[in-house]
């Protein structure tokens, strides 16, 4: 950190342009107003596709970085408005159409429902009896558990929050309009990274966490403590009563009687009755101790508020991002040269570069969250709702996958549109690009090695089982392939808190070791033992993830040029082939790598969620008898069945699809129809992926001829989708069909097993 004399630094000022762009409904009402070509109106059917492709491609609408920045900034507010409306709808359903209040009275027996179907053509069958005399569709979003942890005790509070969501949405829409049409920030404001970091760290993350910690302490803790003790929700004081009357809090947490005295006298240990360090799970609810999570958010708030004072703005003290980057010369062995010189300019002038990094980080974080949701279930009673646990895991894994592919997409767009080779000479980025052949060929070798070896283990096992030679298989009972490193890591995590957190009463997660936590006779979490089957699936994960990385990284590193197409950057981010007369140059654009990466992302994550689903049903989820014996849902069949391809097909896909296939005539029948519809959408995608554009153009021309014959020819000339558009429609339906099919399969299964 350096302290600089005040005159050296340019002062940070918030400067805006007033009324830069007039708001005109007349202009917005004209389709394609953002592009001179599109604004002329449609001559062919390609127009409608280009309209959708370019509406949000601000780079194609203007080359002015300031205007692009303002558009993105304004669009963020629009995005937030949509999120608030969506959240408001969730809370409104909880208030108006749910059994939340009944569920609070008996959360282990009554199932959560927040949707009731109107029986117009007999859909009433979908309204199952979820307990407590309520009929509706069982939900697996986990919102009931979040609401209980937040301290909601009645529908009226949910109503108020729903209205609050709509108010916030309105505020966001206003802000989006105001900051583009009335007071639009200048480019310097968007590029002032030190102020941005300080505000985001201290304000968004720091004060955001502090506010949540405050809510948890003053509202969630007392309400949940009383609910856990069996007090009826209607008898619990309302949130404002706890906030305004400290004597009510002192009855539950005696330290409240002392007020802020211990804080200012540094006698903080007094507050340990509500800021705890227990570890493990609450034995009543199977969720993390709320007093632990309040403590966690308070600590996070302190860290981020400190972090938000780290960067130098107007006070001549703190870090300068540019100085840090320019001063970082990198590892002399691997990436010497100019190190990170020039990267500050890259990240402040290319929002694609910035977005690529943020998407990669956020996507990875989402997948980490997926694993924490079951290993350390944060909300009360969440852990024994297996449908919700499976849904939350799948959701966060898939979101992470899409964001990581998005990182590859925007990395490639950055390379094509924003990268300036002259400004990146011998720095880390330039050296990575110059090492691309070594990187990609090594990655390719890794993929081949992993693919042949992991698949080879399965082929061996299927062959041995087919020939009736179980003693020659790789399994826990024959030739063992124990994941010794994973077991060591598990054991380390189980034992480490004893040394690193000596005051914690229990391990962070029982998934690593310890006891079985059961709530109302159902397993919430227990140690997850790993064996040969996990070792084999793990290497399939390694294989598919490395292939996804290979495709995305090749797309980024070869986005501007390659030996095959040296002038690729002139062709842009998306193009089908390198023009007529050059065969064998298709699917080389940055866009095509994203297209192919999406298939491998889906492939790779399907195996992840299948592994999770079966492993949990086989080795974790189940019922606990009074004598402590655990009966797992599928009776521990994972270890012996998941070691052959046939086992995966027979004992996972086929056996567990029984619930969705046999769902007709029951409350789960909608999933049966969705299962078929998902297969149909998936099959429909293949029509776009397997056929070429010329086939359809020929067909269309003969249809147009027939229309001309009948004198009903359209004014807008029909055209086949472009090659890229066809692939886009194909991959969209492939993923949609696959996701819907998996959704129906998982939900019908998990709701059937309770």
From Swiss-Prot:
Broad class of the protein's primary localization: membrane
Details of cofactor binding: PSI electron transfer chain: 5 chlorophyll a, 1 chlorophyll a', 2 phylloquinones and 3 4Fe-4S clusters. PSI core antenna: 90 chlorophyll a, 22 carotenoids, 3 phospholipids and 1 galactolipid. P700 is a chlorophyll a/chlorophyll a' dimer, A0 is one or more chlorophyll a, A1 is one or both phylloquinones and FX is a shared 4Fe-4S iron-sulfur center.
Matches recorded under InterPro entries: PSI_PsaA, PSI_PsaA/B, PSI_PsaA/B_CS, PSI_PsaA/B_sf
Keywords, sorted A to Z: 4Fe-4S, Chlorophyll, Chromophore, Electron transport, Iron, Iron-sulfur, Magnesium, Membrane, Metal-binding, Oxidoreductase, Photosynthesis, Photosystem I, Thylakoid, Transmembrane, Transmembrane helix, Transport
E.C. code: 1.97.1.12
Subunit structure comment from the entry: The PsaA/B heterodimer binds the P700 chlorophyll special pair and subsequent electron acceptors. PSI consists of a core antenna complex that captures photons, and an electron transfer chain that converts photonic excitation into a charge separation. The cyanobacterial PSI reaction center is composed of one copy each of PsaA,B,C,D,E,F,I,J,K,L,M and X, and forms trimeric complexes.
Protein's UniProt name: Photosystem I P700 chlorophyll a apoprotein A1
UniProt binding sites for chlorophyll a: 687, 695
Transmembrane segments: 72-95, 158-181, 197-221, 293-311, 351-374, 390-416, 438-460, 535-553, 593-614, 668-690, 728-748
Binding locations of phylloquinone: 696
Catalytic activity: reduced [plastocyanin] + hnu + oxidized [2Fe-2S]-[ferredoxin] = oxidized [plastocyanin] + reduced [2Fe-2S]-[ferredoxin]
Topology versus the membrane: Multi-pass membrane protein
GN (gene name): psaA
NCBIfam families to which the protein is assigned, alphabetical: psaA
List of residues binding [4Fe-4S] cluster: 577, 586
Known function: PsaA and PsaB bind P700, the primary electron donor of photosystem I (PSI), as well as the electron acceptors A0, A1 and FX. PSI is a plastocyanin/cytochrome c6-ferredoxin oxidoreductase, converting photonic excitation into a charge separation, which transfers an electron from the donor P700 chlorophyll pair to the spectroscopically characterized acceptors A0, A1, FX, FA and FB in turn. Oxidized P700 is reduced on the lumenal side of the thylakoid membrane by plastocyanin or cytochrome c6.
Gene Ontology cellular component list: photosystem I; plasma membrane-derived thylakoid membrane
Enzymatic class: oxidoreductase
Recorded GO MF terms: 4 iron, 4 sulfur cluster binding; chlorophyll binding; electron transfer activity; magnesium ion binding; oxidoreductase activity
Native source species: Rippkaea orientalis (strain PCC 8801 / RF-1)
Residues that bind chlorophyll a': 679
Upper classification of the organism: Bacteria, Bacillati, Cyanobacteriota, Cyanophyceae, Oscillatoriophycideae
Record localization: Cellular thylakoid membrane
Any one of the GO BP annotations: photosynthesis
HAMAP family: PSI_PsaA
Family: Belongs to the PsaA/PsaB family.
């Amino acid at each position: 950190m350096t302290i600089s004399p005040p005159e050296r630094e340019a002062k940070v000022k918030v400067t805006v342009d007033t009324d830069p762009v007039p708001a005109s409904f007349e202009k917005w009402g004209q389709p394609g107003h953002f592009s001179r070509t599109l604004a002329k109106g449609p001559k062919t059917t390609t127009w409608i596709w280009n309209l959708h492709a370019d509406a949000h491609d601000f780079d194609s609408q203007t080359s002015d970085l300031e205007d692009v920045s303002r558009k993105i900034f304004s669009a963020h507010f629009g995005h937030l408005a949509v999120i608030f409306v969506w959240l408001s709808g969730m809370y409104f359903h909880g208030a108006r159409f749910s059994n939340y209040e009944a569920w609070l009275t008996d959360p282990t027996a009554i199932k959560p429902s927040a949707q009731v179907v109107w029986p117009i053509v007999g859909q009433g069958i979908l309204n199952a009896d979820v307990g407590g005399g309520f009929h509706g569709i069982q939900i697996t979003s986990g919102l009931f558990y979040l609401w209980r942890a937040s301290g909601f005790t009645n529908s009226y509070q949910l109503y108020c929050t729903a209205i609050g969501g709509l108010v916030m949405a309105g505020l966001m829409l206003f802000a989006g309009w105001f900051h583009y049409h009335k007071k639009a920030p200048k480019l310097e404001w968007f590029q002032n990274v030190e102020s941005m970091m300080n505000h985001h760290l201290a304000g968004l993350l720091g004060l955001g966490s502090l506010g949540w910690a405050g809510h948890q302490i003053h509202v969630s803790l007392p309400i949940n403590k009383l609910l856990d003790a069996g007090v009826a929700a209607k008898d619990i004081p309302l949130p404002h009563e706890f906030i305004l009357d400290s004597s009510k809090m002192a009855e539950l947490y005696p330290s409240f009687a002392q007020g802020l005295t211990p804080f200012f006298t540094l006698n903080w240990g007094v507050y340990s009755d509500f800021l705890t360090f227990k570890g493990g799970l609450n034995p009543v609810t199977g969720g993390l101790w709320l007093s632990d999570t309040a403590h966690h958010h308070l600590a996070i708030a302190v860290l981020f508020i400190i972090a938000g004072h780290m960067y130098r703005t107007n006070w001549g003290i703190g870090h300068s991002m540019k100085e840090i980057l320019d001063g970082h010369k990198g590892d002399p062995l691997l990436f010497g040269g100019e190190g990170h010189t020039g990267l500050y300019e890259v990240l402040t002038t290319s929002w694609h570069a910035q977005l690529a990094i943020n998407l990669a980080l956020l996507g990875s974080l989402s997948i980490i969250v997926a694993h924490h949701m079951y290993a350390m279930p944060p909300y009360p009673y969440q852990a024994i709702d297996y449908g919700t646990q499976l849904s939350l895991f799948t959701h966060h894994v898939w979101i992470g996958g899409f964001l990581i592919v998005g990182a590859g997409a925007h990395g490639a767009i950055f390379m094509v549109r924003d990268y300036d080779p002259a400004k990146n000479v011998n720095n880390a980025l330039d050296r990575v690009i110059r090492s691309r052949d070594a990187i990609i060929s090594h990655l390719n070798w890794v993929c081949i090695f992993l693919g042949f070896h992991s698949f080879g283990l399965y082929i061996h096992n299927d062959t041995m089982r087919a020939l009736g030679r179980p003693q020659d298989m790789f399994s826990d009972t024959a030739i063992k392939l124990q994941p010794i490193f994973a077991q060591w890591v598990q054991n380390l995590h189980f034992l480490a808190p004893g040394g690193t957190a000596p005051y914690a009463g229990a391990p962070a997660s029982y998934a690593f070791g310890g006891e079985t936590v059961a709530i109302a006779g159902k397993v919430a979490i227990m140690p997850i033992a790993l064996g040969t089957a996990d070792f084999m699936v793990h290497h399939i994960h390694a294989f598919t993830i490395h292939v996804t990385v290979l495709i995305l990284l090749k797309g980024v590193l070869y986005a501007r040029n390659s030996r095959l197409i040296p002038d690729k950057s002139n062709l842009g981010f998306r193009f089908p082939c390198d023009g007529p007369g050059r065969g064998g140059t298709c699917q080389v654009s940055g866009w095509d790598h994203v297209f192919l990466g999406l298939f491998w992302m889906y492939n790779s994550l399907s195996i992840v969620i299948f592994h999770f689903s079966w492993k949990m049903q086989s080795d974790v989820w189940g019922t606990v008898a009074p004598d402590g014996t655990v009966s797992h849902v599928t009776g521990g069949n994972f270890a012996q069945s998941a070691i052959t391809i046939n086992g995966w097909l027979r004992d996972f896909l086929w056996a567990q699809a029984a619930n969705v296939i046999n769902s007709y005539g029951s409350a789960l029948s909608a999933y049966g129809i969705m299962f078929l519809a998902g297969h149909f959408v998936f099959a429909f995608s293949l029509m776009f992926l397997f056929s070429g554009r010329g086939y359809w153009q020929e067909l269309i021309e003969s249809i147009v001829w027939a229309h001309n014959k009948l004198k009903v020819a359209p004014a807008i000339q029909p055209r086949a989708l472009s090659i890229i558009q066809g692939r886009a429609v194909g991959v969209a339906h492939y993923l949609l069909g696959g996701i819907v099919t998996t959704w129906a399969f998982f939900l019908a299964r998990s709701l059937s097993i309770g």
